């Protein structure tokens, strides 16, 4: 009862704030909050929010572009197809802070070096866009998310008053940036998440993310804001501090099976099947292999052609995970490898061999664990062709 009452009061108070433009005092501060990654898959790259604090007015709010409504009709379908709308939400800072303390996730605050007019302009912009008719937007992982939106807000509100001393460096592709984070360079490794993302992301992920493009990652947005210049002289960031520290946890990593270890092991074991005469065993293995590849191909084809997820378009992984492998698997189970399927096997073998030969110059970076899988496919195709001769 008390919890529901507090929630109602929070919603009511935030609703009152949205409905009116409050003049900020000279003591007001607007800052960027950069949150470290969490354990859930959707928390792997951290989070970004904007804090508006004005002690004289009794304001301490967090504006968050990472909100979506689980009660949305057909939520799961819309989420999968990339049609789910995200929105800008407002919360009291204390509630926001409590959440990250409970999850043991660090929060870094960068206070912007705004004058009063700039503070008011940004605050008014946020309030206007938090209104129900303006709050929703079409989320895009690379090009329009909770982090990149903050960059856009400052560009839109400050105009020519904000410039950047863009550093000269070798910019990475979107995929390389994701790999850098997931591979444990900054946070604990997530090898299976890394493998899954490399499989589902298409060629757009291999485009170079420039200074503005890389702001889709909260840490890089925070870093790039340090190169901001206000009114041709002052730095954009006035101060930088950790407001929610992260407690140290054990760095001991227990042995675990990674995609690379698993698939190289399977590839090695499969090589011995050339000497196995048990037709039932090898037939079952080939059926499972090509059925799994085919079903994966159906998923990736759907993500490319049936959704609005642009990052999944033009996925070359379909070359070795063809949806047609499902039909091949069925015919393997039926012992029906006729002339058509022999030609299909030959064509598939050529495609997979070419992928291996041109691995380093393909327009899409494949995950290293895909190499032993493709090698395994080649071995089983050769075995199938030999068996049908």
Language model features: what each stretch is:
Residues 117-126:
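Short, charged, amphipathic alpha-helices and their helix-cap/turn boundaries
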């Amino acid at each position: 009862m008390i919890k529901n009452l507090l929630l109602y009061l929070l919603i009511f108070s935030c609703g009152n704030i949205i409905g009116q433009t409050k003049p900020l005092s000279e003591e007001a501060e607007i800052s960027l909050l950069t949150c470290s990654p969490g354990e859930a898959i959707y928390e792997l790259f951290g989070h970004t929010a904007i804090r508006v604090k004005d002690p004289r007015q009794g304001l301490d709010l967090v504006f968050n572009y990472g909100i979506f409504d689980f009660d949305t009709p057909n939520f799961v379908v819309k989420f999968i197809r990339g049609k789910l709308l995200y929105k800008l939400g407002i919360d009291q800072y204390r509630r926001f802070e409590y959440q990250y303390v409970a999850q043991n996730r660090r929060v870094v605050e960068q206070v912007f070096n705004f004058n009063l007019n700039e503070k008011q302009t940004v605050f008014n912009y946020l309030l206007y866009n938090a209104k129900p008719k303006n709050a929703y937007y079409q989320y895009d992982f690379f090009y329009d998310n909770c982090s990149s939106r903050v960059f856009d807000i400052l560009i839109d509100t400050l105009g020519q008053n904000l410039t950047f001393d863009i550093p000269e460096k070798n910019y990475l592709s979107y995929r390389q940036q994701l790999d850098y984070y997931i591979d444990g360079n900054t946070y604990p490794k997530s090898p299976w998440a890394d493998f899954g993302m490399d499989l589902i992301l298409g060629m757009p992920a291999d485009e170079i993310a420039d200074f503005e493009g890389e702001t889709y990652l909260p840490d890089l947005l925070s870093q790039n804001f340090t190169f901001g210049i206000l009114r041709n002289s002052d730095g954009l960031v006035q101060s930088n501090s950790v407001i929610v520290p992260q407690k140290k946890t054990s760095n001991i990593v227990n042995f675990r099976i990674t995609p690379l270890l698993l698939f190289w092991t399977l590839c090695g074991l499969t090589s011995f099947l050339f000497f196995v005469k048990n037709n039932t065993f090898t037939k079952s293995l080939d059926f499972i292999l090509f059925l799994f590849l085919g079903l994966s191909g159906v998923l990736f084809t759907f993500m490319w052609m049936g959704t609005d997820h642009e990052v999944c378009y033009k996925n070359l992984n379909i070359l070795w995970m063809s949806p047609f492998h499902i039909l091949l698997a069925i015919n393997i189970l039926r012992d029906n490898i006729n002339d058509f399927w022999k030609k299909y096997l030959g064509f598939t073998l050529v495609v997979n061999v070419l992928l291996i030969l041109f691995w380093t110059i393909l327009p899409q970076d494949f995950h290293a664990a895909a190499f032993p899988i493709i090698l395994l496919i080649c071995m089983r195709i050769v075995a199938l062709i030999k068996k049908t001769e």
